[in-house]
Amino acid sequence: MVPPSGGIPPAHSALFAGKGAVPVKWQSFIAAGRECMAGLPDFAPGEKGKAVYLSGGDSLKDRLPQLEQALEGEMGKTLFPFALIAVTPKSWEEEFSPWAAPALSRKTPAFTGGGNEYLRDLAGPILQECEERLPLLPGRENRALAGYSLAGLSTLYALYQTEAFSALASVSGSLWFEGFLDYMEKTAPRCRDTRVYLSLGNKEEKSRHPLMRQVGDNTRRAIEVLEAQLTAPCTLEWNEGGHFDGVTQRLCRAIRWMMEKK
């Protein structure tokens, strides 16, 4: 799972901005039974922006102020103006796993394989609710999806399940998940022009767990598969540290890559 956010307060304030920054308004709501937290730049009347959806739990939701603060000065300059929308799953091990799999240890829950339902809801009623409620540009070309850890696996799984997003970022994704690389190799992406960003910490493959230590080789293989399958750019970025290091910074790099003006 994504680590705790290190004491970052929940982002429920109405407005926050640093010196010289674009003000960002926050609001929370329920869509398809899942809590959504949206951070919106202070658009002019009638103006709309792109959307970066973040799959994750409460710890990721509480990182939103840090992410916005790191990126807001670049909006409208090197980055397209965009909203950050965190979607909290009903259950991490259920909704971010593509199929059922045994627990990693006696202390953790088994994976129950509800990933298809989560992505159907995300690409359907959740997107619909967000685009009706928020000043967002419609269409897949204006939507991106990112996730960390098991949510990063879910994000890459979305490449093969939905056409709703034009850019995907699997950040320190759990590509050790049993059978996932075989699935990638045997399955065609829904849209070959989807841009995909992968990243991994350079110490993540040094895990003591025999399954999790495969994450390095699997991620290297995944980028090769993507380069063969896709017509749009894809990239693999290596970060310093293990799975729980620099989470906010890694997410910022991924969002920057997806939202950068070309």
Stretch-by-stretch model annotation:
Residues 4-262:
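Non-catalytic cap/lid and distal C-terminal segments of serine-dependent acyl enzymes
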